[in-house]
Amino acid sequence: ARMHYLKIQIPHTYRELIRMGVEFDFSMAYAGAPGFRAGLCSPFFFYDLANETETNLSVVPLGIMDVSMKKYLKLSRNESIALVDRMVDTVKNCGGVFVSLWHNESFAEDSDCNRVYEHLLEKAR
């Protein structure tokens, strides 16, 4: 699952996902900035503190979103590429998993976001 606009209410959202049988969530991110909202770049199981319960919901942290770079931070193509490079290098050094979010409009052939995405694919190999 991924919540639209990355809007989650912890623990309510996660409890509802568990109730519906969802096993993975990709909403743990900041909409307006890059970075790992939970401080981790590896998936982890949601632990319900209020109920002192281990769950089977795997939270997969999202490192960056196309809209963050383009709309919120107003980065140029080169600035976005530099940011992606730093993030991918950091995740590789930690042995983590780099997950990003790209909207379909970012894949227009002449889009700067498309070029950044292509660079990301090469960098992450």
Which residues fall in each region the model found?
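Active-site-adjacent pocket scaffolds in enzyme catalytic domains
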Residues: R2-V91
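C-terminal domain-boundary segment and adjacent tail
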Residues: N78-R125
